[in-house]
Design a protein with these regions (language model features):
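N-terminal, post-signal-peptide region of Sec/Tat-exported proteins
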Residues: 49-80
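Short acidic alpha-helical/loop segments enriched in Asp/Glu that coordinate divalent cations
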Residues: 150-153, 177-180, 192-196
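Post-cleavage N-terminal segment of exported redox proteins
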Residues: 2-60, 87, 97-162, 188, ...
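Short cysteine/histidine-rich metal-coordination sites, predominantly Zn2+-binding motifs
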Residues: 93-102, 195-204
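The canonical Cys-X-X-Cys-His
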Residues: 74-86, 136, 164, 175-186, ...
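Conserved short C-terminal alpha-helix that flanks the catalytic cleft of nucleotide-sugar-dependent
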Residues: 67, 167-168
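Short Cys/His-rich "knuckle" micro-motifs
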Residues: 88-91, 189-193
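C-terminal cap of thioredoxin/glutaredoxin-like
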Residues: 166, 173, 181-187, 199-211, ...
């Protein structure tokens, strides 16, 4: 079954012209960058634009409740330290992943939330890709909606950005493709009826209609890696955080959209 699926996907890629490009990919120029929103149909755009119709906003509302709820042995809520998220969290998600000095490596926003739970609330971490973590992340990220992505400038991050870029450019898996072959070289094409976008992470966590739920950027990355029939990574793996870091640096200056809606 896996072999047959691989052949089918390879055939779709050939039909789309995705494997008929030069071996050396070309990075997208700044002036050509486009949010995934611009590739969507009018109904999907309208759903994202209207907060009363955007299903991702339900998750963000749940996140607001979690923000104000006391948790852990310390009996603290996020609001006890950070106050009103609409002020204190403005622009925060636009800077993540960020460097964590005690760990000596970058952490994404979900990991920062769980580190805060452990360090300050003395609470158990939220499991990856479960509703509570996605909802609280969406609520925090929503406070940066409309603000430009502004990656953490810490010099300590630069080696990790380089690792993320190497991952994005490197061909891998049974299909022998890199992220760049689809998202730099072929973003003007379609694959299985869906547009191939430029992979700018402007709206995560997103509400994806295919999933019928909120989902993280790492969920999307893992889906892509599975599609290449390549070795995958656990949620929170350093390799995925490094890739997130590179993608955010690649999207520098683009406006945040969380919670975005995608097909």
């Amino acid at each position: 079954m896996k072999f047959g699926t691989t052949i089918l996907l390879a055939s779709l890629l050939v039909t789309a012209g995705i494997v008929l490009r030069p071996l050396i990919a070309t990075e997208i120029q700044s002036a050509e960058r486009r949010s995934g929103y611009t590739f969507m149909g009018p109904e999907t755009k309208a759903m994202q634009d209207d907060d009363t119709a955007n299903p991702g906003m339900l998750g963000a509302l749940d996140g607001e409740a979690l923000w104000n709820r006391k948790a852990g042995a310390a009996g603290k809520a996020c609001a006890d330290c950070h106050g009103d998220a609409r002020a204190s969290m403005k622009g925060v998600a636009a800077r993540y992943p960020a460097y964590d000095k005690p760990l000596g490596r970058p952490v994404n926003l979900e990991q920062r939330i769980n580190l805060c739970r452990a360090r300050h609330q003395e609470a158990d971490p939220f499991p990856y890709e479960k509703h509570d973590l996605l909802a609280l992340t969406a609520f925090v990220a929503e406070q940066s909606r409309g603000m430009p992505i502004a990656p953490d400038p810490s010099p300590e991050l630069q080696p990790f950005v380089a690792k993320g870029r190497d991952f994005f450019m490197h061909r891998q898996g049974q299909l022998n493709l890199g992220c760049t072959n689809c998202h730099d070289d072929n973003w003007d094409k379609h694959l299985a009826g869906s547009p191939v976008t430029q992979a700018h992470p402007t709206g995560y966590p997103i509400y994806r209609l295919e999933w019928q739920s909120l989902g993280s950027l790492q969920r999307r990355l893992r889906n892509c890696i599975n599609g290449l029939r390549a070795q995958n990574f656990d949620f929170g793996a350093p390799e995925l955080v490094e890739l997130e870091l590179y993608l955010m640096s690649r999207a520098r200056g683009m406006p945040m959209e969380t919670p975005a809606v995608r097909p």
